[in-house]
Structures are given as structure tokens and as C-alpha cells.
């Protein structure tokens, strides 16, 4: 197995520490590894699927993703992955390469928060085209404004822009004009810029995606690249002054 493929999967839900605990669902008949996840403050919800995954059926409880990534970092690129079990329950993952092996203790899946199912999904009035140039600009802009937590989507029904650090008063800010495939004149809506930056970093190899915005305070973005499909929902933050 290629270690980097597994690490890429993990980083798409881990988001540099936004989500640390998750249940991985391995399905041998579909050759698929998937996960549904939620941030600690419940403002980010996501689901992730990787195909061409040749592994046994199992529910794998990962309580401390940071520790798992550190252990995987010890390994060479070509690895063998196996599960240690007690009855039907998976209790550890063993990863080995030509020279060494690591053992990661799994968590009981019952102590990991189960993300809620999305029920009443609002209409998305705005669809923003996400390009590699936008991804690099947003990441650079957020890195320049380290202490700024939010970005705001502003549109007049014709022109749309994302502003990191927006406020009604004069502030340090980064403004990124964007193109849209669907647009309406909605009120300004703001989201967590730190989380969105990590989503973009984890999926920066994607050539195109669409960020959908609802005036009811929800955004959705889906990335499809290589063997990965990832969807993230962000809940709007309190109105920016």
C-alpha cells in the first residue's frame, strides 16, 4: 500500500487539527474507505471517500489522529497495513515497511462523536468558482492576517468578492474578487477563515470546485480529485460589525 495515499486521506478530515477523532469505515466489496466527521465546535461537518482501497471490512476508531500521523511519518512510502482484533472488534492498526513497524491503538467507536445527518438543507443562492489561483490567494491572504478569524462573502447580485477581515470600519483586510456560476443579491454572510484555509490546503491539488453559499448561514464545498471525494459544510459565524 502507498503510505502517501492514506496520509492524504487522513489530512482531508484532520485539517491540521480541526478534527482529531473519527471513525473510518472500510468496505472491501466497494474497495472504499470513508469517514464522516465534525469539528469540536460543531461549525464544520464533512464526509470523505477514497476508492481503490483494498482492505478488509472494518470500523476503525481513531481517537488521536495527530498521534497516528506521527507514527506514519516513521514509515517508508511502501507499507503493509493490518488490523489486530479481539473477536469482531478492531483494537489496533499495525503498519510495517521493509525495516520497521508501528502499532497504533484504536479507540472504541462508541466514544467518538457521531456527526448528525444533514436534514433541512437550505437553497444555495450563490455558487462561487474555486480555482487553483483562488486557493493560493486565500491561503496567502489568511497567512498574512494571522489574527483574523473570519471571511465575508459580499455580493450585489452582479459582482462577488470574498473579504478576509471585513468590517464596517477601516481594517487590515484581503479582498479576492471571484466569478460565479449562480448569483443572487443576498446579505453579507461570514464564515470561519481558519477552517476554510485548512480545507483549501488539504485539497489544494484540486483543479476546480464550487463553493455554494446560502443566505440562511450555510456553505458547502465539494472536491473531486484522484481517488478522493470530499464535501465540507461550514456554518456561518455571528454577523461581522
Segments from the language model and where they lie:
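DNA polymerase processivity clamps
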Residues: 1-104, 124-241
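Long, charge-dense
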Residues: 109-128
Amino acid at each position: 500500500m502507498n503510505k502517501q495515499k492514506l496520509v492524504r486521506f487522513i489530512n482531508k478530515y484532520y485539517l491540521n487539527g480541526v478534527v482529531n477523532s473519527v471513525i473510518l469505515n472500510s468496505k472491501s466489496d466497494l474497495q472504499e474507505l470513508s469517514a464522516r466527521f465534525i469539528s469540536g465546535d460543531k461549525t464544520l461537518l464533512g464526509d470523505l471517500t477514497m476508492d481503490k482501497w483494498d482492505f478488509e471490512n472494518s470500523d476503525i476508531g481513531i481517537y488521536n489522529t495527530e498521534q497516528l500521523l506521527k507514527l506514519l511519518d516513521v514509515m517508508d512510502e511502501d507499507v503493509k497495513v493490518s488490523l489486530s482484533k479481539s473477536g469482531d472488534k478492531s483494537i489496533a492498526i499495525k503498519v510495517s515497511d521493509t525495516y520497521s513497524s508501528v502499532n497504533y491503538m484504536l479507540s472504541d467507536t462508541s466514544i467518538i462523536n457521531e456527526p448528525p445527518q444533514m436534514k433541512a438543507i437550505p437553497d444555495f443562492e450563490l455558487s462561487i468558482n474555486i480555482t487553483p489561483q483562488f486557493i493560493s490567494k486565500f491561503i496567502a491572504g489568511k497567512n498574512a492576517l494571522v489574527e483574523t478569524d473570519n471571511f465575508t462573502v459580499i455580493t450585489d447580485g452582479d459582482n462577488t468578492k470574498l473579504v478576509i477581515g471585513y468590517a464596517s470600519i477601516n481594517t487590515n483586510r484581503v479582498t479576492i474578487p471571484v466569478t460565479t456560476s449562480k448569483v443572487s443579491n443576498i446579505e453579507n454572510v461570514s464564515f470561519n477563515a481558519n477552517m476554510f484555509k485548512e480545507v483549501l490546503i488539504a485539497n489544494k491539488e484540486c483543479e476546480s470546485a464550487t463553493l455554494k453559499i446560502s443566505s440562511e448561514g450555510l456553505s458547502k464545498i465539494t472536491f473531486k480529485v484522484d481517488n478522493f471525494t470530499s464535501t465540507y459544510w461550514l456554518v456561518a459565524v455571528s454577523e461581522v460589525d
